[in-house]
Regions:
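C-terminal charged capping/lid subdomain of soluble metabolic enzymes
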Residues: 44, 50-119
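Active-site segments that bind and position negatively charged phosphate/pyrophosphate groups
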Residues: 1-62
């Protein structure tokens, strides 16, 4: 689950936006794939192989392309998320139980950057 779900849970808690959890996961996934890239061993190569992609491809780029093909929003901003929301989102994400399964636990500053990158 990891950081993708931590961010999705934080965003899903916003009752004004009423965002779909699965869509959030898809939109956020490329950002977290990049963040974790150097901490996952050969797992990305295995996923790329299962996707029938060259293992030297960038998995985050491949997921972004897939997201585009299936019509997902191109970022959190397209879903109504604003930069003003980030401090609350970070606070929620930092304490989410899904962090127990992340290969790389972000610091507060890294959480902020991750939300900005996912915008």
């Amino acid at each position: 689950l990891g950081a993708v779900h931590s961010m999705s849970h934080a965003l899903g808690a916003n009752q004004e936006l009423r965002l779909h959890h699965g869509t959030l996961n898809g939109v956020i996934l490329p950002t977290i794939l990049r963040f974790n890239r150097d901490h996952v061993g050969d797992k990305y190569a295995k996923i790329l192989r299962a996707m029938r992609k060259d293992i030297s491809a960038d998995l985050a780029d491949e997921i972004e392309q897939l997201n585009k093909e299936i019509g997902l929003p191109n970022g959190l901003a397209a879903m109504g998320v604003t930069e003003e929301m980030i401090p609350d989102l970070v606070a929620h994400s930092m304490t989410d139980p899904s962090n127990a399964t992340t290969p790389r636990l972000p610091s507060q500053e890294e959480w902020e950057k991750l939300f900005l990158e996912a915008m």
